[in-house]
Structure formats: C-alpha cells, structure tokens
From Swiss-Prot:
Name the UniProt record assigns to this protein: Nucleoprotein
GO function terms (MF aspect): RNA binding; zinc ion binding
Entries under InterPro entries matching the protein: Nucleocapsid_C_arenaviridae, Nucleocapsid_C_sf, Nucleocapsid_N_arenaviridae
Entry's Gene Ontology BP terms: symbiont-mediated suppression of host cytoplasmic pattern recognition receptor signaling pathway via inhibition of IKBKE activity
Disulfide bonds: none
Chief location of this protein within or outside the cell: virion
Record's function text: Encapsidates the genome, protecting it from nucleases. The encapsidated genomic RNA is termed the nucleocapsid (NC). Serves as template for viral transcription and replication.
Lineage, opening ranks: Viruses, Riboviria, Orthornavirae, Negarnaviricota, Polyploviricotina
Subunit field text: Homomultimerizes to form the nucleocapsid. Binds to viral genomic RNA.
Organism: Alethinophid 1 reptarenavirus (isolate AlRrV1/Boa/USA/BC/2009) (Golden Gate virus)
Amino acid sequence: MAAFQKAAVNQLALKKKLNKMLAPYQRELNNQIFKDVKALRVGLDINKVNDTLRRLRKETKGPNDLKNLRDLNETAAGLSGMVATQRTVEIDSSLMSDEELIQCIENIDVIKKKAEYKGGSRPRISEFESETGMSKSDHEMFNKLFNRFAPKKDPGPAAFSTPKSWVGISPADLANQFGTSPAITICLIMMRTNSPFKQILDALHDISLLDQGMFVNASVVKAMTSQHPCLDCVEYTVPKNSSGYNITVKAVVKAANVLSKLPKVEKLVIDDDNRVEIIRTLLTIQRELNIKIQVNEERGLFEDIFYKICVSPNGPCVVSIRSELTGRGWENTIFRLRRPPPYAPRLYPDLMDLDLDALPPVKGDKKTEEESKIYIFKPAADEIDEYIRSPESASSDSEIPDPRVLYMANACEDLFKGGDSVFMDIEGTAQDPVEIALFNPDTGKFVHIFRMPKDKDGFKKASKHAHGLLLDDISDHPDLQTDKNIEAFFSKVPLSARIFCQGSDIEECLKFFGRKDLKPTDCKWKREEFMKYHENILDELSEVFPCKHSGTVKDKKGALTAPHCALLDCLMFSRTASGGKKTKDPTPATI
C-alpha cells in the first residue's frame, strides 16, 4: 500500500512539474474549441455516433465496424479546426547536447518497442528470455530439448483463451483512430444531456481546478454530479476499445484542462521554433525525477507527452484530432539528425539515414475562417400542438383542422394492407408513452410515433436507464403526434388485427387510446430470446433506421449500453417469432 501511495505521489509531482515548466509553450485554445463545438453540434449525426459506439461494444469486431469508425472520424475531422496533418518533423540536433540527443533517441526507441509489443506486430519478450538472456532461436531450441528430455507434468485444465477483439484487421489500420477531442466530448455532453453550454463550462471549470492539485478520477466526478447534472452522462465502465465518442472521465478531464486558464499540458502548442526547447525541458524533468521508460509497464504521463512532442505535427499536440494520420508516429515522422551523436550509427543505424524522402502532405486545410464568437442556438419547438389544443382555438368561430389526423388514419389502413398480424411496442408508461411502434412482418410496413411526455420527471428517469430519449429528440421529430392524432390512428385498427407484444403494458396503452376491444397477445419471451438478434438487425439497418436516441443509457456498473427503441424491439420480436428468419426491410406506412 505504501509503495502504491509513493507511486501516486510521484505521478502527481510529475504532473505539477510538467504543467509549470511547460507553461511558456502553452496557448489559449478556447476560441478554436468553441468554433469546433459549434460546427460539430450542427454537423455530427448522433445516430451514427450511437451506431459506432454499439459496434465498438461488440466482443469481436470486423472490417465493417472499423470502416464505420473511420468514416465517422473523417466526418468529425472535416468539421474541426484542430486536426493533425501528416508532415515531416525535423529535430535540430545542433541545439542539443550529446547526452540529450542520446536520451531522446533511447526514449523514442523504448516507446516504439512498447507500441509494437502492444499492437501485436512484434512478440513481447517473455520473463524467461529476459532472465536467461537467450535469443529467440536459443529459446526455441531450449523448448525442444526440454520437451524431449525433461519429465512431463500433467498439463491440467486448458487455460481460458480470450478471443481477439478485432478479426481480419491489420493493427496499422487501428492506429490513431481512438483518440479523444475536447470539442467532440463537449458536443456529445450537450447532445446527451441537453444542458446549457454555460452549465457545462461551469462543470469543466471546477474539474480543471481540482485536477491542478490531484488526479480527478471516477469517484470525484460521481460526487460532482449532484452539483453539475451534465456530468451524469460520463461513462465509468468502457469497452476495451473506447473511442473519442465515449464520454469517459479521462476525456472530460482533458476537455476541462484545455479550457482552463491555469498552466496545463493539454494547452501545449508546438512549432519548428519551440519543439527542441520543449524536448530539452522534458529531458531535464526526466533527469531530475529519475524517470525511466520501461517496455513492460503501461504508458505513463511523461512518455505520453514526450512521444507527442517528438512525433506530432505542428499545432496543439495533445488535443488535436489525429485520425487523419496514417501509421505510428515514427512512421509519420522523419528525424533529420544534422549532427549525429557519438556512436549513433552503430547504436541506431535506422535513424541515421539522412536521405529519406519527406512524406507528402495528406490533406490541406481548406477550412474558412469563422466568427471568433460562438453562438449555440437551440431550435425552437413546434407550437402547433399547443395552438390546436388551446382554449382560444376551441372557442373560435372556425376550427382549424389538423391534417395529421387524416394522415394517421390513412397510415393505419396502409399498415394492415396485406396482413392483419403486427408487432407492437412502446417506450415510457402505458398511460404516458413517448414512443409507439407497430411493424407488419408480412409487408415490412411500420408506423413509428413519438409523443411528448406529461410526466417530465418520470421521463428523465426512464431516459437514463431505458430509452435514452431527450425532449429535443421528440419535439424535433417529424413523427411527433398529439393524443388526438394517436387516437385517430388506433381508431382505424381493424377488429381482425392480431397484435403481438411483450408485456401487459401494451393492452393498457390500447385502452388509454380508446381501444378496450383489442386484446393483444403477450408472447412472454425471455429477454435473451429476442436480444440475440439486436446486433444483427442494427448491422443490417443502421443506415436507414429512423430512430434517434441522443441520451446516455448506462447499466448498473455505469457502462454505456444500447438505448431501448420501440421500433427495434418490434423487429426483434418479429425475428424471434419467425425462428431467426430475416423479414422484409422495414418501410414506413404512408397514404
């Protein structure tokens, strides 16, 4: 326990020293962050974000899942101003002493080996090889001799093998695709909580203050949630491949620090003039604190900053989006050592080639300048429902007919053309549903209805633990309907209709909308019976799925989970009833 406390104190002392000594190279990035938030808020599709997160939660992922992530990263990079672009990085060795240059190269070499072992492109040296000093060929010969002459023991039970997370994917294609961006993090907090921008800034300000003197962890953020409700969307349990679209504690702290007025390493901005000075400062800190980078240890704060300074293109090296870069940092970077250190050709011949061609630029910056100020506007809610139901309109001489009443009645008739069997599901309570879906498996036609909740507190609670809907998701949805419109729809359901569902709440919902005569059939499936089709259906239909659930849904452990969706549930019920057979692709029922 004492050793753990000592290590934690050393890391905290290191963080304070890095923040302080690197302060001359830090810049205010707030204006650019705010511009990026504004652009992302408008251009980022929350449905694609949710689909990407769902794919990354899979135990086994393939090429289609990676393509989905890379496409989303490309969209985010196109909307952002702080994007790292591929270029040649030169380190002027004439400004460094021999000791500094040798230490710099050794650090990069160890970081490179560590990344290769972790990425699987190079096998990790076993503890046995390390202790005996054997080469790989010696170790193989030892194993042959040992198996031939040494007495054999009972192997015991077979060890549990963990399946590969990515199948059919080169580790090089995964590089630079999982970093976080403060602008994306802030944008997603706004989308998932519908919190005012000022409230989010207040929460991030408090986090940055705390992080100046301690390490802000999950327990700290949880404690702050009561004062800052916008932090309720933070994920405390994340999958192995968490991405820049997971609102993790680390991502929130990073966003808080880059907006802080205090000295923070997140605000580092490098260029050709200060890169070597920053490296020399880091090497001074390394000597003073006796820091040694180890291959068999997790990447620490020092080596993370050191690596980014040495191999990153000019600009904000800690918070820039790096998904536009290909390969590892040392592949994107060419070190032109203009004055080789002593014995460098013998120790590091791979770094001494001074005739390497520079990498061509991948993508130019085509973004136009925007206003320096940020204005985030919340769309005004459609007030037609309130106008139609207002006392003034009821007492007026001429009643304004709602065209959606006729539309919904015709949609119901279209739904039951070609078959009387439908699956039905709702989100919310039977007397206060916020989402209603019906799906006809014979024709593939569906009706998808949204409704504003009466019980706002109950809605917010269900949003966090079930459907993930926000009020904006409903109020801005083209399928938003009033009770009168929904009653018009159900009034056209034929008596011959066979409605299949899961749970007794569907019958109560039908009664609420005036159809006491309809008796739905409760299938009473176990959850695992229909949930096994969840991923396959979304993989097939994610591009055309009309549902939008922007909120954060977390399980009991605080891990992000898929939101419940009434239409998706209907499709799963249909797939279950057919024994797993694929039904017709869903299309909306229209006039």
